Amino acid sequence: DELVEYACYCGNYYGTPRKYVEDQMERGRDVILEIEIQGALKIKAKYPDALLLFVMPPDGETLKKRLSGRNTETPEVIEARLKRASAEADGIESYDYILVNDDLEKCVDELHSLIACQHWQVKRNLDFISRVRGQIKEF
């Protein structure tokens, strides 16, 4: 129960410490996790207001070139990662939004915009709405 989520990705186990996530949330901070679909769905089940963003390349060939261009993985590992990416892509509909990582700066800006929009959802601002509504009624 020390991990809020964990999953096996290409033969390695990864997890997110619960204490870190909860500490950040208590401080009112946004928590950004770079996790695969198993973990993302676990997060959404535990935190229904979580925003799930699927970051994807502009096309399959770009993904393959990026993985190969790193020169850090064996051909077998690259093949395993491409197969995993295919399986993950089958679950995109479980996410709230996609971000196309074609231009890094643009992708980061879009990420920030989506997060900012979440802060202004009506359901997240009921106290503010109630306060202003009450003030207006005093006129």
Question: What does each model-identified segment do?
Answer:
Residues D23-E26, K44-P48, D90-I92:
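Conserved catalytic network of the ASCE P-loop NTPase/AAA+ motor domain
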Residues D1, K44-Y47, R66-L67, D96, ...:
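Short, flexible helix/strand-to-coil boundary loops that buttress conserved ligand/catalytic motifs
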Residues D1-V31, I37-L41:
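ATP-dependent small-molecule kinase phosphotransfer cores
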Residues D1-V4, R66-E73, L114-C117:
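Conserved AAA+ ATPase "sensor/coupling" helix adjacent to the nucleotide-binding pocket
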Residues V31-E36, A45-G69, V100-N101:
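Conserved phosphate-donor/acceptor-positioning beta-strand/loop module used by diverse small-molecule
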Residues T72, D90-F139:
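NTP-dependent small-molecule kinase module
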Residues A50, G60-T62, S68-D90, E105-K106:
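Ras-like small GTPase catalytic G-domain
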